Amino acid sequence: MTQSSVDIHAISERVQQESLVVDRIFQEMDRVIVGQRYMVERLLIGLFCDGHILLEGVPGLAKTLTVSTLAKIVDASFKRIQFTPDLLPADLTGTTIYNQHQGDFIPKKGPVFANLILADEINRAPAKVQSALLECMQERQVTIGDETYHLEDPFLVMATQN
């Protein structure tokens, strides 16, 4: 056997193993989410490609339930952020809090420090908040005070808008 045929065989086995994992994810999702196979496929593509996703649709399509279910299935941390006109950038990223006992400021990390983030109704947020989220998505890090923190891997933002 040549070296290239061994590599092809190994690749073929790896693809078969990975497809079993994907099939298992679909089976688990189908137990909770009915009639949204297209959306589930797109969420998995985003997850596997390390990209971010914008989910558009009318209320009641189970967008939130789908994302939270996916997070449970892949054993990832999950946070849902409800975007409102009065939301501040620090509400996403976090801030420093004064600790009277230590006489020092300590960081309080925001909800972007999770693997899967559901940015619900992102179109309702002010531009500064959207900008803060876009920075997290692009740089995959957050600065709180003087410290920079790397976001967890995988880091996937799934934003919804109605």
Regions found by a protein language model. Give the residues of each.
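Short beta-strand-centered segment that lines the nucleotide-binding/catalytic pocket of NTP-utilizing
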Residues: 56, 77-89, 144-153
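Short glycine-rich substrate-engagement loop in P-loop NTPases that contacts/grips substrate
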Residues: 87-116
